[in-house]
């Protein structure tokens, strides 16, 4: 069998995500339906081939504007070096990118921003839990730090739920605007809107 040809055909024909043996086939359209039913505004294929992990993005975390740097197992430095993060994602060939879009009264509508962020995290966790059943090795990267626990156990004790923990795309060094562009979707949908973006590495 010509394995190079087989890999080429799988890459060229994104009709679904093929899982061999006793596992199932879940098509992109099915993933879209699941994501839309959960509440995501947009669900598309993630262009994994173009993902770059940038030191300058990781450095933005170190400025600690979100007050989570060094305080959460999902954030730097606990989530690993960029080299370790690159090793994490290198084993994946397929993924999806998802978005939640909110409407704002004006550019100073902080309440609307927080409501959309909370809604996105709710969608994200539901999608993670749903996909985990189909893809046991799922890697989920969200928007913002992990909020599974009211207070993270870092650094005093091990993570309480390592299988449910998730890091952000930025923690892994991804420039979200670039990932969106490379995956063929918008990052900004115009005045009066705000969008939160996450991604799932499936296999």
Model-derived segments and spans:
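Short, Lys/Arg-enriched N-terminal segments with co-localized hydrophobic residues
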Residues: 9-25
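Catalytic cores of enzyme domains
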Residues: 28, 41-72, 76-203
């Amino acid at each position: 069998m010509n394995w190079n040809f087989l890999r080429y055909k799988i890459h060229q024909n994104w009709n679904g995500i093929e899982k061999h043996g006793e596992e199932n086939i879940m098509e992109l359209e099915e993933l879209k339906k699941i994501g839309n039913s959960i509440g995501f505004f947009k669900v598309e294929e993630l262009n994994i081939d173009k993902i770059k992990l940038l030191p300058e993005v990781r450095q933005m975390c170190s400025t600690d504007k979100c007050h989570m740097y060094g305080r959460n197992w999902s954030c730097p430095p606990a989530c690993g070096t960029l080299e370790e993060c690159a090793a994490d994602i290198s084993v994946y060939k397929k993924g999806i990118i998802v978005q939640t879009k909110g409407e704002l009264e004006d550019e100073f509508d902080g309440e609307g921003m927080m409501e959309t962020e909370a809604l996105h995290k709710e969608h994200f966790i539901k999608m993670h839990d749903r996909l985990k059943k189909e893809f046991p090795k799922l890697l989920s990267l969200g928007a913002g730090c992990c909020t599974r626990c009211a207070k993270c156990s870092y650094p005093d004790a091990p993570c309480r739920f390592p299988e449910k923990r998730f890091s952000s795309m930025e923690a892994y060094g991804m420039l979200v605007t670039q990932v969106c562009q490379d995956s063929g979707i918008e990052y900004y949908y115009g005045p009066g809107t705000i969008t939160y973006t996450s991604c799932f590495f499936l296999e």
